[in-house]
């Protein structure tokens, strides 16, 4: 899963970048720095060097082919009330497109403090498995998916590409998540064999006990994150 023989560059960044760096270094990665045009003029981000521009990657592809990359820009579901959400989402896919179009080596980061079964588990490239997560036997994790601390995924579950499972998300066994699913903090899919469709947004602390439709928002308050949570959605 973790290929530490090739030096690592973070493409894009976020306010929690040092946690990614800490885990990468603990695993044994040699972190060369960050490439992020938003911060290139500053020459660093939170004391981590900004080493090039995104155009440099394309113009000097042969040089950068000796590195591997991890996209560190986060995305959130689109929210017209928070302009930064839409921009981060657009930036995220732009950076992923650079990595794919230039066929760069893609890193996967799995914390040594995560509990990952050795039995028929697949974790896709570009994904992040945080500390104290449980990945159970026969689980399949897609590409570019971020699974944050204390997430517990039951056996024989599938998580698609470009998903975000925020802290303390819980999935029962046999659950399947499509692509670009966003599970909020403390959200729960408690019924076995439930399917969470592409682009579903499950708000924090919501419990889901049925299949969802593509693009569905699971909340009693639409997209207003200020409203009350901790309710069960069953019908």
What are these regions (language model features)?
Residues 1-2, 121:
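Short, flexible hinge/linker loops that cap or flank conserved catalytic cores
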Residues 2-75:
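A solvent-exposed beta-alpha-beta segment
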Residues 19-21, 80-82, 212:
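Short glycine-/acidic-enriched loop or helix-start segments at secondary-structure transitions
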Residues 59, 77-79, 136, 172, ...:
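Short glycine-rich, flexible loops that bind phosphorylated cofactors or substrates
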Residues 63-140, 144-146, 152, 157:
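Extended, small-residue-rich solenoid/repeat segments and analogous flexible loops
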Residues 166-235:
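Glycine-rich hexapeptide-repeat left-handed beta-helix
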């Amino acid at each position: 899963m973790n290929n530490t023989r090739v030096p690592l560059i973070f493409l894009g960044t976020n306010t929690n970048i040092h946690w990614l760096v800490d885990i990468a270094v603990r695993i044994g990665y040699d972190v060369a720095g960050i490439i992020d045009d938003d911060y290139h003029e500053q020459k660093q981000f939170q004391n981590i060097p900004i080493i090039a521009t995104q155009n440099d990657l394309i113009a000097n592809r042969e040089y950068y082919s000796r590195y591997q990359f991890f996209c560190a820009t986060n995305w959130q579901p689109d929210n017209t009330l928070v302009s930064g959400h839409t921009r981060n989402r657009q930036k995220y896919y732009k950076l992923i497109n650079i990595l794919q179009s230039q066929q760069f080596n893609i890193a996967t980061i799995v914390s040594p403090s995560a509990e990952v079964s050795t039995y028929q588990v697949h974790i896709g490239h570009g994904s992040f498995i945080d500390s104290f997560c449980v990945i159970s036997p026969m689980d399949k994790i897609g590409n570019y998916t971020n699974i944050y601390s204390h997430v517990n995924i039951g056996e024989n579950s599938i998580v698609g590409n470009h998903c975000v499972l925020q802290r303390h998300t819980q999935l029962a066994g046999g659950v399947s998540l499509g692509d670009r699913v966003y599970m909020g903090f403390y959200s729960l899919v408690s019924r076995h064999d439930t399917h969470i469709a592409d682009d579903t947004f499950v708000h924090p602390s919501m419990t889901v006990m049925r299949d969802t439709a593509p693009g569905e928002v699971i909340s009693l308050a639409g997209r207003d994150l200020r409203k009350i949570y901790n309710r069960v959605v069953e019908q």
